């Protein structure tokens, strides 16, 4: 299988802990023995801090976006270092470069690409471009809920939903002040338009990522730490 993984910076680069990078690298190395794997790293807290500083100095939003992209690529560079010889040595800066890099047989790692797009959106577009078998959004949330569980204690978690239902949930959450959607709206639209199979999962524990993508990914069976998004009945 070809898997595109959006690995949130908030879980990968938390406290810039080198041991975390090494743990994720070990898991990704194992997954790559069974699947072709391309990873997009997020910026996390470091990106938010740098962007906040830039805004405080009056920087425009495009400049802030480029700063965020730079931070995602720094996280990608650290993950490549953790992967050692199993990681593709260069960071693709566009979708064409990424499509060529996957032929290397190594774990390909990249960051953001275009201002105005989150790394979730980049991952979804890349998954569509490469006709990936699965898009995985690895985050700190254990799946998709009927509403933001941080704001609504009655929110219900889904084991599996359709892309169309995902769009409805995401747009409803995004409309509410203070609420945060588990999937970027652009990424959700990409998933819908190309009927892409996707998994949103809590990957704060790297071993969970290995268990799900290493063994259960082909079964599409319910997972306690995530939600499958599929157009299949």
Swiss-Prot record:
Catalytic activity of the protein: UMP + ATP = UDP + ADP
Activity regulation reads:
Inhibited by UTP.
The protein's superkingdom reads Archaea
Binding-site list for ATP:
9-10, 44, 48, 139, 145, 148
Check the record and name the Pfam families matching this protein.
Answer: AA_kinase
Q: Which InterPro entries match?
A: AceGlu_kinase-like_sf, Asp/Glu/Uridylate_kinase, Uridylate_kinase, Uridylate_kinase_arch/spir
Under CDD domains, the record lists: AAK_UMPK-PyrH-Pf
Location(s) in or outside the cell = Cytoplasm
Q: Which residues cross the membrane?
A: none
A GO CC term assigned to this protein in UniProt:
cytoplasm
Q: What are this entry's molecular-function GO terms?
A: ATP binding; UMP kinase activity
Residues noted as binding UMP in the record, renumbered to the chain: 43, 65, 113-119
Q: What keywords sit in the KW lines?
A: ATP-binding, Cytoplasm, Kinase, Nucleotide-binding, Pyrimidine biosynthesis, Transferase
Q: What is its EC number?
A: 2.7.4.22
Q: In which pathway does it act?
A: Pyrimidine metabolism; CTP biosynthesis via de novo pathway; UDP from UMP (UMPK route): step 1/1
| Keyword Cytoplasm appears in the UniProt entry | yes
Q: What class of enzyme is it?
A: transferase
Listed under GO biological process in this entry are:
'de novo' CTP biosynthetic process; UDP biosynthetic process
Q: How does it assemble?
A: Homohexamer.
What this chain does, per the entry, is described as: Catalyzes the reversible phosphorylation of UMP to UDP.
Family per record: Belongs to the UMP kinase family.
Please report the name of this protein according to its UniProt entry: Uridylate kinase
Q: Which organism is it from?
A: Methanosarcina acetivorans (strain ATCC 35395 / DSM 2834 / JCM 12185 / C2A)
Taxonomy of the source species: Archaea, Methanobacteriati, Methanobacteriota, Stenosarchaea group, Methanomicrobia
Primary gene name: pyrH
């Amino acid at each position: 299988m070809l898997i595109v993984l959006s690995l949130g910076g908030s879980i990968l680069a938390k406290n810039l802990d080198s041991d975390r990078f090494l743990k994720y690298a070990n898991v990704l190395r194992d997954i790559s023995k069974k699947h072709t794997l391309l990873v997009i790293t997020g910026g996390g807290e470091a990106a938010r801090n740098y962007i906040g500083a830039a805004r405080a100095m009056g920087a425009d939003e495009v400049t802030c976006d480029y700063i965020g992209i730079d931070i995602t690529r720094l996280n990608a560079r650290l993950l490549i270092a953790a992967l050692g010889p199993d990681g593709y040595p260069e960071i693709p800066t566009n979708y064409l470069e990424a499509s060529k890099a996957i032929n290397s047989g190594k774990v390909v790692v990249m960051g953001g690409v275009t201002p105005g797009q989150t790394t979730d959106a980049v991952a979804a577009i890349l998954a569509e471009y490469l006709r990936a078998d699965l898009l995985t959004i690895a985050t700190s949330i254990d799946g998709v809920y009927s509403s933001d569980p941080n704001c609504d204690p009655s929110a219900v978690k889904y084991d599996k939903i359709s892309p169309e239902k995902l769009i409805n949930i995401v747009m409803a959450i995004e409309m509410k002040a203070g609420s945060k959607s588990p999937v970027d709206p652009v990424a959700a639209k990409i998933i819908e338009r190309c009927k892409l199979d996707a998994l949103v999962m809590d990957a704060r524990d790297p071993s969970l990522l290995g268990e799900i993508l290493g063994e259960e990914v082909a079964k599409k069976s319910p997972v306690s730490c995530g939600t499958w998004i599929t157009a299949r009945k």
